[in-house]
Amino acid sequence: MTLYKLVVLGDGGVGKTALTIQLCLNHFVETYDPTIEDSYRKQVVIDQQSCMLEVLDTAGQEEYTALRDQWIRDGEGFVLVYSITSRASFTRIQKFYNQIKMVKESAHSGSPSGASYLGSPMNAPSGPPLPVPVMLVGNKSDKAVERAVSAQEGQALAKDLGCEFVEASAKNCINVEKAFYDVVRMLRQQRQQQQGGRAQDRRPTGLGPMRDRDAGPEYPKTFRPDRARHRGGIKCVIL
């Protein structure tokens, strides 16, 4: 079964954990408990195709910037979250996006600091770098009376960044699946394009025999080698 690694990024308190748990465990978490790193797995069917999602819920605090580089290196697609009730969290989205771009470009250029796992479609050994699949999510759309960021501003930022946009409510389970599933759709399209390119050009790469991406690339068992700071381990939900 094909595995997709998604990473959720954004300021603390914007609802990253609430969105992730609503997607994977189908319930809403009322209490805010700052996350360092939690990983969840869920088997889903998207457009009549079964797949496994591995969703990494990350810390938004500034002191975890170094860890964030590792999370980004290991991720394939990204869900960037801000709260519509917080202009500061919206302003910080550009910083998170720039960090994604910097880390992925470093990985593609072959920098040791940007090395990622083998088989990542985002880090092909040759050719131009592929666009990084990103979904911008304005969470807490249920708090309309507290709105500090308009939907039009969110759409404009997404256009500037070249990514998709949706407003969502983890509390009311509105557009939660769309936020994650659309990233998977982008990843699928990229993998299909890469498979088509390899069918036309099968030159040796020095990395061993060609493999079918959708047959299951080789992934590490964890997002990062240091598990000491991992609070909850991998949560696995099989539907």
UniProtKB/Swiss-Prot annotation:
PROSITE patterns: RAS (PS51421). Ras-like protein involved in the activation of Ras protein signal transduction. Ras proteins bind GDP/GTP and possess intrinsic GTPase activity. Plays a role in hyphal morphology and conidiophore development. Required for full virulence. SMART domains: RAB, RAS, RHO. Belongs to the small GTPase superfamily. Ras family. One of its GO terms (cellular component) is plasma membrane. The conserved rasB internal amino acid insertion (residues 109 to 131) is required for the function. The gene is rasB. Disruption phenotype: Causes decreased germination and growth rates on solid media but has no effect on total biomass accumulation. Leads to irregular hyphal morphology characterized by increased branching. Also leads to decreased virulence. SUPFAM superfamilies: P-loop containing nucleoside triphosphate hydrolases (SSF52540). A motif (Effector region) lies at residues 32-40. One of its GO terms (biological process) is hyphal growth. Residues 199-226 have a biased composition (Basic and acidic residues). Its EC number is 3.6.5.2. Keywords: GTP-binding, Hydrolase, Nucleotide-binding, Virulence. GO terms for molecular function: GDP binding; GTP binding; GTPase activity. This is Ras-like protein B. Interacts with mpkA. The keyword GTP-binding applies. Residues 191-227 are annotated as: Disordered. Transmembrane segments: none annotated. It catalyses: GTP + H2O = GDP + phosphate + H(+). Induction: Expression is regulated by the cell wall integrity pathway transcription factor rlmA that binds the 5'-YTAWWWWTAR-3' motif at the rasB promoter. GTP binds at residues 13-18, 29-35, 59-60, 139-142, 169-171. It comes from Aspergillus fumigatus (strain ATCC MYA-4609 / CBS 101355 / FGSC A1100 / Af293) (Neosartorya fumigata).
